[in-house]
A protein has these predicted regions:
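Outer-membrane beta-barrel biogenesis signature
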Residues: 6, 21-42, 47-61, 131, ...
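Outer-membrane beta-barrel pore domains
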Residues: 51, 58-64, 95-106, 204, ...
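Residues on the lipid-exposed face of transmembrane beta-strands in outer-membrane beta-barrel proteins
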Residues: 40, 44, 69-78, 112-117, ...
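Bacterial N-terminal signal peptides
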Residues: 9-18
Length: 340
């Protein structure tokens, strides 16, 4: 009887051990394995304007004439169970323009460089340099529908160096809070400037805030699926600097996908500045309305984008010849983008 009792206890222990082993194995199998990734883009283009001098709109990127280079963008990332990092470097004219706030040396290559840690479920802390959370458009040409960029994107922040906390509050509700150096100052805080940022995400719509000494920007970025193949993106922003200087704008991005390989999209942007902000004029107030029509042909990882753009300003800001200025400008761009 005593031996039988010992046998039953031993059998129970073995059963529990095997069960816990299976459960541990199932847990290990369901947990995502750490991953190391290498990705990026390469882009190049041809640009011309329908004027005697090949002047370009005063927006970032895609503003060189004739056959021109965009950038090579290489991203190395590692994602573990609770932590990871991103190292994002850029080469070429577009990359140099994107990191214009760098003081020099190797930092001129750094587009993003940050590490993150999930301190709890739905709470992530990120430290380093990362692209901005404001605006509809981004630095990578593969992530934008239009190849040329808007005035709102061009004169808003490109990146921030600091710390931020991302909170997942519900399935479609998120909150980000951050403390940053001076906007676009990549390496360090050289002027003891501190900015504060916040983002509230509600069902795919985002309210963004960036504030610091002599700077305040409020931004809305979002969009709606009007139909299965028709999307409408929206961006609106207003920024106030020292004194009465500042800018504001709104843009609509209707995009129609006609097949697996072709889509067509329009960007209509109204942009205004006050007290010589400098995007359009150096003194006084000015505004500009632009229409950009872009086609997107895709084959695998390759995308071909022909684009026609018209800018119309409130004053003659475009130097269309050595002796003549105009209040409007028409441009044409053909871009090739490869993503991997």
């Amino acid at each position: 009887m005593k031996n039988l009792k010992h046998l039953l206890i031993l059998s129970l222990i073995v059963t529990l051990f095997n069960t816990s082993g299976v459960m541990a194995q199932e847990t290990e199998e369901t947990e995502a394995a750490p991953s190391f990734n290498f990705s990026g883009t390469v882009d190049t283009y041809f640009r011309t304007s329908f004027s005697e001098d090949p002047v370009a709109p005063g927006t970032s990127f895609a503003n060189l004439n004739g056959f021109a280079l965009g950038m090579a963008n290489f991203i190395v990332s590692y994602e573990g169970e609770k932590s990871g990092f991103v190292a994002d470097v850029v080469f070429g004219p577009r990359g140099s323009d994107a990191v214009f706030g760098s003081v020099g040396n190797s930092s001129e290559l750094v587009n993003q460089l940050y590490a993150y840690y999930d301190i709890a479920e739905g709470v992530r802390i990120t430290l380093g340099n990362f692209n901005t959370f404001l605006g509809y458009e981004v630095i990578s040409p593969a992530a934008n529908f239009n190849y040329s960029t808007s005035y709102m994107f061009s004169y808003g922040p490109f990146s921030h160096t600091g710390v931020k906390a991302d909170f997942t509050l519900a399935d479609d509700i998120s909150l980000m809070l951050g403390v940053f150096n001076q906007t676009d100052q990549t390496e360090a805080n050289y002027d003891r400037y501190t900015a504060f940022g916040a983002q509230l995400g509600l069902y795919g719509q985002y309210i963004n805030l960036l504030a610091g000494e002599d700077y305040f920007q409020l931004d809305y970025t979002g969009g709606f699926d009007i139909a299965d193949s028709f999307f409408l993106g929206i961006n609106a922003t207003t920024a106030t600097l020292a004194g009465d200087t500042g800018f504001a704008g709104v843009a609509l991005y209707p995009q129609l996908t006609t097949s697996d390989t072709f889509a067509i999209g329009l960007r209509g942007e109204f942009f205004s500045e006050t007290d010589g902000f400098g995007a359009l004029v150096d003194d006084g107030d000015a505004d500009n309305f632009s229409l950009t029509l872009t086609g997107s042909f895709t084959s695998g990882n390759f995308t071909f984008k022909p684009e026609f753009r018209i800018d119309s300003a409130s004053s003659e800001i475009f130097a269309i010849s050595p002796t003549e200025t105009a209040d409007s400008l028409s441009s044409f761009v053909v871009a090739a983008i490869y993503s991997f």
